[in-house]
Structure formats: C-alpha cells, structure tokens
A protein has these predicted regions:
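Cytoplasmic/organellar membrane-interface segments at the starts of transmembrane helices
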Residues: 37-39, 92-157
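Short alpha-helical catalytic segment bearing the HExxH-like zincin motif
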Residues: 1
Length: 157
C-alpha cells in the first residue's frame, strides 16, 4: 500500500504539472514535452514504471506477492489479475507516448522548466520508486511482525 501511495502521489503531481502548464485535460492536445523538458520526461517514466510494477521498482514486489498468494488460492483469479496488470501497463505506456512523445510540438517556453520544489518532490518520489524496488526488504522486515500476528489471528479463527 505504501508503494501504491507513492506512485499515486507521483502521478497526481505529474497530472497537476501538466494541466497547470498546458491548460488542458485532453491528452490529444499534449505532446512533444520530452523534447522541451527531458528531466520531467525521465522522472515521469520512473514513476510510470513503478506504477506498472516493472521489476526493480516499488510496485513489483507487492504485485508479485499478491499474485503469488492469489495463485495458491485460485489460479484463475491470478491469471485474471495478471491480465488486468498488463492492460493497465498498456494504457499507461500509451498515455506516456501521447503526452511526452506525441506529435504536437510545444512552443518555446510553453512547458517551462521544472522549479526547484518540483524537482525536489518528483525526484524524491522517483528515488523512492527505485529504492523500494531494489531494496524491498527494508519495508518487508519492518512489516513482518505485524503480518505474522495478523496471520496467526486469521489462522486461529
């Protein structure tokens, strides 16, 4: 849930940056942003990769554990869950392509460079996406006692 929260905050922050700068909610009216602001494009991609649960990002560990647990219970549910993850990834990558690499070419200064506070917030989120994907045991070890006690309660009932 922590990883989901990090990714959701990152995506909402990115959406706010896009809408406040471009004054539109329509992805078809965006495009070509990567040409003007490569740092934003890279940070957006890192958050997106965490959201689609690519290995070595924060979303992967939770998705993997979830699907593994579901597979032991009902394999068809895990297959369905895996398909929804794939469809979500397709949607996210198509959105990124339209927004960052689309055919519209922005005028100089239309998507102004990121401010220091925006770089700090988005950079921190991107750092956490990678850190928690490369080193997930940090959170897993912290949560282990609570998980064990919860499993004992569930198995006792």
């Amino acid at each position: 849930m922590l990883s989901h929260g990090i990714n959701a905050v990152g995506l909402f922050f990115i959406a706010d940056m896009l809408m406040s700068r471009l004054k539109t909610h329509n992805m078809n009216e965006m495009g070509g942003i990567a040409n003007n602001n490569s740092l934003f494009a890279v940070l957006f991609m890192i958050v997106l990769l965490g959201t689609v649960a690519l290995p070595l990002t924060n979303g992967f560990v939770g998705e993997f554990l979830l699907l593994t647990g579901i597979y032991q219970f009902k394999s068809w549910m895990a297959i369905f869950g895996g398909l929804t993850i794939i469809l979500g990834a397709v949607y996210m990558f198509r959105s990124y392509q339209a927004i960052m690499l689309g055919s519209r070419h922005l005028n100089e200064g239309e998507f102004h460079p990121m401010t220091l506070s925006e770089k700090t917030v988005l950079g921190t989120i991107a750092f956490l996406v990678i850190l928690l994907g490369v080193y997930p045991s940090f959170l897993m070890n912290a949560a282990a006692p609570s998980i064990k006690s919860l499993l004992m309660i569930i198995n006792a009932g």
